[in-house]
A protein has these predicted regions:
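Recognition helix of helix-turn-helix/homeodomain-like DNA-binding domains
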Residues: 35-54
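Key DNA-contact positions within bacterial/archaeal DNA-binding proteins
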Residues: 28, 39, 71
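Short, basic-rich loop-to-helix N-cap that marks the start of a DNA-contacting helix
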Residues: 24, 48-64, 80
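A short, Lys/Arg-rich alpha-helix, primarily the initiator
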Residues: 1-29
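Pre-recognition alpha-helix immediately N-terminal to the DNA-recognition helix
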Residues: 10-13, 40, 58-61
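Short, charged recognition helix plus adjacent turn
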Residues: 1-2, 74-82
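Hydrophobic/aromatic-rich, well-ordered segments within soluble, folded domains that form packed cores
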Residues: 68-70, 74
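Residues within the alpha-helical elements of helix-turn-helix
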Residues: 33, 65
Length: 82
């Protein structure tokens, strides 16, 4: 898995963790929050081989809105949450 795929994988790990904690009501609700097309969001979530690109605004939303650590999200260092 290349570096870009690792970032996308951590993005979806964070989304799953936020859903499990009840911070995200549903994946559809989160898709609307970030302005994501359902089919794109779903395909990236389910198909690891297609994880070659992530919208920067989606990453920023996790960092700003949900206190996900940018260090963890981008380079895999430290804890998931700030």
């Amino acid at each position: 898995m290349n570096h870009d795929q690792q970032i996308v994988t951590r993005f979806y790990m964070a989304v799953d963790a936020l859903y499990a904690l009840g911070e995200i009501k549903s994946f559809r609700h989160f898709e609307r929050e970030i302005g994501a097309d359902h089919s794109v969001f779903y395909e990236l979530r389910k198909n690891e081989r297609k994880r070659t690109f992530m919208h920067p605004a989606w990453l920023r939303h996790l960092v700003v809105t949900y206190s996900i650590s940018a260090d963890w999200l981008l380079v895999g260092e430290g804890a998931m949450f700030r």
